[in-house]
């Protein structure tokens, strides 16, 4: 059940950082954190990652509720005793709920983390997005390690 604590921590950190941005920054305002690389940039997104399907909130409500239900079911049924698997699901669940809260309460998601690599500006994201990404990477590691164990590869 420790993985639900991870989920709650992700949600709390996500909502706290978004609240700080909303309270202290104007939309479009940019604060340089690491020169030439990391900025806090206040942005609102009414779509999915990278503004995909902007303006289709009903779709995100439906998909998110279904995904959250599936993740909780999988956590209860299959994740017990599988540490990396349960942690990856906890990050994914926390990220999904964090952005869902924004969509329900504000019909948009607060994004603020902007990274720059040379001339490339990575799409602005938030803690929930980062948690989703970390969860997916951990899930891929779990699948790779589990596959190697199943095949007896060291």
Swiss-Prot record:
It is found in: Cell membrane. Pathway: Protein modification; lipoprotein biosynthesis (signal peptide cleavage). One of its GO terms (biological process) is proteolysis. The chain crosses the membrane at residues 55-75, 84-104, 124-144. It catalyses: Release of signal peptides from bacterial membrane prolipoproteins. Hydrolyzes -Xaa-Yaa-Zaa-|-(S,diacylglyceryl)Cys-, in which Xaa is hydrophobic (preferably Leu), and Yaa (Ala or Ser) and Zaa (Gly or Ala) have small, neutral side chains. It is a multi-pass membrane protein. The active site is at residues 111, 129. Keywords: Aspartyl protease, Cell membrane, Hydrolase, Membrane, Protease, Transmembrane, Transmembrane helix. Its EC number is 3.4.23.36. One of its GO terms (molecular function) is aspartic-type endopeptidase activity. This protein specifically catalyzes the removal of signal peptides from prolipoproteins. NCBIfam families: lspA. This is Lipoprotein signal peptidase. The gene is lspA.
